[in-house]
């Protein structure tokens, strides 16, 4: 049963939502910080933490799962090399969400997601 297992819908069809989160995750891993809406930031946090946990595991199966999700293969290899030394002693909480001023056009709540 899937009680209490809600995923953020983000008002998008499933394929567009997955593509959006994959793109945001790739950009966050590459640049270290991303500015987006607060709802997208909360959804992005889950996916990014999952990728970093896979990188800390370091197994071949984990590497293949990460390559299947992140768009850039070289970025995955770099993440797997650096994750153990950067997040080795940390049990989750690899990202930080900082709220910023609302977007000027539609007044939606904005946030910056950054890697700790």
UniProtKB/Swiss-Prot annotation:
<dbReference type="GO" id="GO:0003735">
    <property type="term" value="F:structural constituent of ribosome"/>
</dbReference>
<dbReference type="Pfam" id="PF01196">
    <property type="entry name" value="Ribosomal_L17"/>
</dbReference>
<dbReference type="GO" id="GO:0022625">
    <property type="term" value="C:cytosolic large ribosomal subunit"/>
</dbReference>
<dbReference type="GO" id="GO:0006412">
    <property type="term" value="P:translation"/>
</dbReference>
<protein>
    <recommendedName>
        <fullName>Large ribosomal subunit protein bL17</fullName>
    </recommendedName>
</protein>
<keyword id="KW-0687">Ribonucleoprotein</keyword>
<comment type="subunit">
    <text>Part of the 50S ribosomal subunit. Contacts protein L32.</text>
</comment>
<keyword id="KW-0689">Ribosomal protein</keyword>
<dbReference type="InterPro" id="IPR000456">
    <property type="entry name" value="Ribosomal_bL17"/>
</dbReference>
<comment type="similarity">
    <text>Belongs to the bacterial ribosomal protein bL17 family.</text>
</comment>
<dbReference type="InterPro" id="IPR036373">
    <property type="entry name" value="Ribosomal_bL17_sf"/>
</dbReference>
